[in-house]
Each structure stands twice: as structure tokens, then as C-alpha cells.
Amino acid sequence: MKSTVKTWAGVGLLLTLGAGFGAALTARAQQQEHFGYQDTPILPGGKWHVHDGTRPQPKVIDPGSFSSQETPGKPPSDAIVLFDGKDLSHWKAGNGGPATWTVQDGMMVIAPKAGSIATKDEIGDCQLHIEWSEPTTVTGRDQGRGNSGVLFFGRYEIQVLDSFESKTYPDGQASAIYGTYPPLVNATRKPGEWQVYDILFTVPRFEGDKLVKPGYFTVLHNGVVVHNHAELLGDSNHRALPSYHPHPPKGSLVLQDHGNPVRYRNIWYRELKDYDQP
């Protein structure tokens, strides 16, 4: 009889321990649903605690793939594609009519004297990816050697130029913020090879005619940082100081026809939003 009592007492103890362990696991699982804390300090200027488990989770995307010289990469899944190698449906001529550059072999080629083209999309703060290539046969010199440009709002220009073993004024070479800042380094590949610009653009802000916040460029040329949060001084100008002129918070992206048959491919952008935005 004593043996039976001891056995049942042992079973009871195991059940009690098991229940306690299960409750602890349940409590831990409930705590981990938020993967964070609510008893930590609130971050300055915001409403979120440090390690706040109720803060919105970042959107999950497919990051895409890198380009090779032979094949353009795959854009991120949340990118807005401006040119996928098929047509110019996202572009227009300067007069608003159809863009008349040539599309061949998965790239668009400037038709010299056809005029610059602009996106139908109006774009604000963004990450822009664009690939370009100069003709393999080198012609011209200085600013006449494969000249084009990527102009945000048609006014803030990142220069496109064949700057491989070719000199020009520094704030006018490839990847320069034209007329303002030369690139930190010259990362230009040989003519005929594909070059890559990854550009982070922060739009200047105006209140009426007053500039309240300047614009900024961060630029990578072939994966190398050539501008690090560079403050814009205004519109890009030739032989004149940059100066600001008021404009809306969104505008077209322009690719410049400077009379040279520069090629472009794999053009896309991602809208840049504040933290915790859907």
C-alpha cells in the first residue's frame, strides 16, 4: 500500500512539473509572438520602444539578381521597370509624343538628333538603377566622346560620358554631378562594356518659391561610391553656377541626347519611403 501511494505521489509530481513546464512554454511562445519588448525606452522623436515587437515588419521582397556583361540582372520585386529591353512604352519625346530612340537586342540606343526622352512616370525620392554603354569604336574627345546624361526632373544631372583614359573638366566626366561635383574616383569601364549607375536621389523641398530642404545624391558607379549624400546646389548648368528653381515633389527622369549613340538597358527604380511605411 505504501508503495502504491509513493507511485501515485510520483506521478502527481511529474504531472505538476509537466504542467508548469507547459505553462512556461506557452508564456514564452506568447511573448515571442511579438519578438520584442514593451518595457524598453522609447526611441527619440518617435513612438516605438527599443526592440519593439509591435513595430511593423518590413515588407519581404525578392532582391533580384546582378547583371553580367552579357545579361542584365533581374530587378527587385518591388521595382518599377522603366525599360526591360522590349519597347519604349514608359518613355516620351520632349514634345510629349512617342519616343523615337532605337530598340534593338534588349537595349535602347540614342538616335542622334532625335532629342532627349523622358519618363511618363513622375518620380520622387527614389533608388534608380540604370546601365549604359559607349560605342566600342571611339570617336571624338573630351565632352564629344559618348556624351549623354541622366537628369532627374530634367535638371539635376548625373553625367554619362566615355571617361576611360580620356580627360575632360572633372565636374563634367562620367558620374559627375554635372557642373558641381566630380566623382570621388573614376570608375569607368572600357568603351563597349556595360557601366552601372545606382543612384539614391532625395528631392529638394520647396514651400512656394522658398527652398526649405536641398536635394541629395548618393551614387555608385560600377559598385563604387562616387558621391556620398552630396548636397545639390541647384539645377545643373553649363558654364554657369547651379541654382534652384521651384518645382513639384515629383517629376520626370530625362535621358539626354547629346548627339552620341550611347546605349541603355535594365532601367528601374524603387520609391523610397520613410521607415514603417507599407
Regions found by a protein language model. Give the residues of each.
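N-terminal secretory signal peptides that target proteins for export/translocation
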Residues: 1-7
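Bacterial N-terminal signal peptides
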Residues: 11-23
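Carbohydrate-interacting regions of secretory-pathway proteins
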Residues: 25-278
